[in-house]
Amino acid sequence: QTFLDDLAKYTGVTVKPFFAADYAGIIEGMRFGKVHVAWFGNKSAMVAVDRSGGEIFAQTIAKDGTEGYYSLLIAHKDSPLNSLADVLKCDKSLNFGNGDPNSTSGFLVPSFYVWAKNNQTPDKCFKRVLTSNHSGNALAVANKKVDVATNNTENIYARLAKTNPKAFKNIKE
């Protein structure tokens, strides 16, 4: 709420939050005039520009000057998975949390760097493949509902560590 209050004060406009389960919902909200400002990753931002007339006007920069964020594969801290090679055994024994199809870090980047570059797909490798947003994937890993999932550094280190430290302590990259 603090961010919304600050934004309203700075712009002089009443700011109302809009919630959706995924990027597609936010993009459609923009398309129909329900959303005027949103935070997207690269892929969803491009879709918002194409489908909703959005404009890209800012980029995240950390206090240390680091630009953007990075895609991750995460597992429970007690998991025997410690490397990409462990994940790519593809023996259909594991459950996988895939990201929102409109997410750069949760779907697009892993689709290329993990799956395409290794001539694999999640469906060939895992017993079950579930699709969720970053928060859902983090909680699924922390609660051992999936064995490995996609995520990103911004969601894990900037959000989850602050909003749910117990879950954060149960996750490793």
Predicted features along the sequence, with ranges:
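Periplasmic-binding protein-like
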Residues: A62-L72, K162-E173
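Extracytoplasmic small-molecule ligand-binding "clamshell" domains
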Residues: Q1-M46
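Extracellular/periplasmic catalytic domains that process cell-envelope and extracellular macromolecules
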Residues: R31, A48-D50, G65-G68, K89-D91, ...
